[in-house]
Amino acid sequence: MAEPFSIVTGALSVAALFNNCVTSFEYIQLGRHFGGDYERCQLKLDIAKTRLSRWGQAADINNDPRFAIDEPQDKISRQVQAVLEELEQLFSTLQKASKRYAIDAVQEDLALLQIEDMRPVARNLHSRLDAIVKQRAKKTSFFKKTYWALYDAKNFEKLVTQATGFVDDLEKLFPVKDARRLVDIEIEEVKEDEPSLRALQSAAADTDSVLAEVVAQRLATSGDENYIKELRNDEQSRVRLGSEWSASALGRGIGSLAPTKNRADFVVARGSSVTHIGNSYGGRGIFDD
């Protein structure tokens, strides 16, 4: 079981509150019940953290003197402080709920998934998003933290939904005028192969609309086009439409988004025949025996 993080009380500047909220995402682990959805859920947390850090960079929160004090004078800065305090309280509330759950849970249900359990594409995205955030936020020395866990989908959705809402509120107070440019930079810092972009697109849904939109546009304008106008095949034949990546190719990000077109007007597949309309990255494909 993960231990909860403890907070050293005391007055903090608005900037320190912001940095603490960003850092708090890094101490959340997910329980085994997330199973096959683990990668998407972990990336959702990463994207929520990245979006918060993006707002902080746009607001210049670590350099603007208005945010360097614990009792800001202007109205907007006080509103920012209030939102960040609510986000901080959300982390604390869910941590307490997890602690309560752990009291009666059997040991097996307290097993945790690890970043090492992720496949190469998702693990690489997690690492690169984390690196982006570390460039934007500062480490806080006011807090002693250890890892804690979310064990069920209900509290996970509560965290993501409410945290996203709080960032929405922050963006209304300090709009991210160059959000598109910052997102473009983020995408350039991750591998722009199709599997990575599709993983980002799935995880960004309902969490980061700007990121989801930019990824969708890149996929639409740069991805492979694979097409069969008419297909006739029997039960024994095997037909694959679409590009495929070997495990090693996924790990190295092989698969350029330079547009390719693979088209067939008419395909007849019979017996033990194998047909693949698309690109194959990294050597042997799914039909290679």
Where are the regions a protein language model picked out?
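Short hydrophobic membrane-inserting alpha-helices and related fusion/pore-forming segments
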Residues: 1-13
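Long amphipathic alpha-helical coiled-coil
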Residues: 9-12, 39-42, 46-49, 167, ...
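Conserved, well-structured core segments
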Residues: 10, 16, 148
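Charge-rich, amphipathic alpha-helical segments
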Residues: 17-142
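Regulatory helix-to-disordered linker/tail regions at the edges of structured cores
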Residues: 85-88, 92, 108-289
